[in-house]
A protein has these predicted regions:
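Compositionally biased, intrinsically disordered low-complexity segments
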Residues: 45, 54-56, 63, 70, ...
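Assembly/oligomerization interface modules of large self-assembling protein complexes
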Residues: 24-108, 128, 164-168
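Charge-rich, low-complexity amphipathic helices
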Residues: 45, 54-58, 62, 144-148, ...
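Extended, non-catalytic structural segments that build the interaction scaffolds
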Residues: 67, 114-115, 296
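Sequence/fold signature of self-assembling virion shell proteins
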Residues: 3-48, 164-217, 242-356
Length: 356
């Protein structure tokens, strides 16, 4: 049987003697759970829990005075929606034979316990890498989830060959933002470059002089005054857009847009007093899963809102569940399992301005 784990690490004397001696590939550094939580509002909820928002009283005051006025009933704006948590699971199994023939074989137990990887360096590395993959799953579901997910071939946006069950756990924040902008066009600032038919055309269009700064200026002008007056509001943007913005400002004004790295990976800057955060995780997900092979689906995206308005809910204290790890003696198989629930909501749908 050929190795399926560490398959490129042949067990030769000149190779490493331990999995721990391998060098970790350079991490992106911006896709941790800590960074995810900086710009969303995480809630512990149950399916069916309400989100009730109380608005203002209808406008009042009509002409007239004197005795016997006409009395009418009034109305106070209000909305009610409910959480609808979807289930996610991660279920993995491995047999020790997956590492036979590689130098990871040196980490196996001897004798009867050879099949148990749980307390070996192999199991430690496996659990660590799997846990990080689960965090990336949270990013993917919370922002790109779609209960009606479809492949490009079925009039959807998912790349050919993608397993749609990796997305249909819940409707993510982008799905909710797209739906809201479809119902209220004033909340959308259009980006023409997204509609181009090839990667090169998309990039060329966004890099044209004045385009990126024009989009951002329009986004800020189009936004509800309750967003622009909110000191907590931030513009979240794909790396593709922020790179174009940096280029445009450099060309137009001959200055470099200053970026500050925070939270060990998030880059932020300010434009006309408004904070902008570069969310490169979005770009990677779009390139991996919303790619037709000739063009990307909305590679340039901006979301302008108070993070309090971007809600992510789970029924547990945190978004991540503890990874359950065990060795099944009868099957001589190692198992890793985690499960949880997830949903998203926009607290106030009218307090998001988007560009795409």
């Amino acid at each position: 049987m050929s190795a399926t784990l560490f398959e490129k690490w042949a067990k030769n004397p000149e190779n490493l003697a331990s999995v721990r001696d391998a060098i970790d590939a350079t991490a992106f550094g911006d896709d941790s759970l800590e960074k995810f939580s900086q710009f969303v509002n995480i809630q512990r909820v149950k399916s069916g829990d309400p989100i009730a928002v109380l608005g203002g009283y209808d406008d009042v005051g009509k002409s007239g005075a004197g005795c016997n006025p006409t009395f009418t009933t009034g109305h106070i704006a209000n909305t009610l929606k409910r959480w609808d948590l979807g289930d996610w699971q991660v279920a993995k199994k491995e047999c020790y034979s997956a590492v036979l023939g590689t130098f990871a074989e040196f980490a196996l137990h001897a004798g009867t316990q050879v099949g148990d990887l749980t307390d070996t360096e192999i199991g430690t590395v496996y659990a660590d890498k799997l846990s990080k993959a689960i965090v990336r799953m949270i990013w993917r579901l919370a922002w790109f989830g779609d209960k009606a997910a479809k492949l490009v071939s079925n009039s959807g946006v998912l790349t050919a060959g993608t397993d749609k069950t990796m997305f249909d756990v819940c409707d993510g924040l982008f799905k909710r933002i797209f739906t809201q902008c479809a119902s209220n066009a004033s909340q959308l600032t259009a980006i023409a470059a997204n509609g181009k038919s090839t990667y090169a055309e998309q990039k060329s269009a966004i890099l044209a002089e004045g385009v990126a700064t024009g989009i951002l200026e329009s986004l800020l002008m189009d936004a509800d005054s309750r967003i622009t007056s909110n000191s907590n509001a931030v513009v979240l943007a794909t790396k593709g857009f922020t790179d174009a913005l940096h280029h445009d400002i450099k060309v137009k004004y001959h200055i470099n847009l200053p970026w500050t790295t925070i939270f060990e990976g998030f880059d932020v800057t300010e434009f006309d007093g408004v904070k902008i955060a570069r969310v490169a995780v979005w770009d990677r997900i779009i390139k991996a899963y919303e790619n037709t092979g000739t063009a990307l689906n909305k590679p340039y995206r901006l979301v302008y809102a108070d993070p309090r308005n971007l809600m992510v809910g789970s029924n547990a204290d945190g978004l991540l569940s503890e990874l359950d790890i065990w060795f099944e003696k009868k099957e001589r198989m190692n198992y890793w399992y985690a499960t949880g629930k997830l949903d998203t909501q926009l607290l106030e749908e009218d307090l998001v301005q988007a560009a795409y």
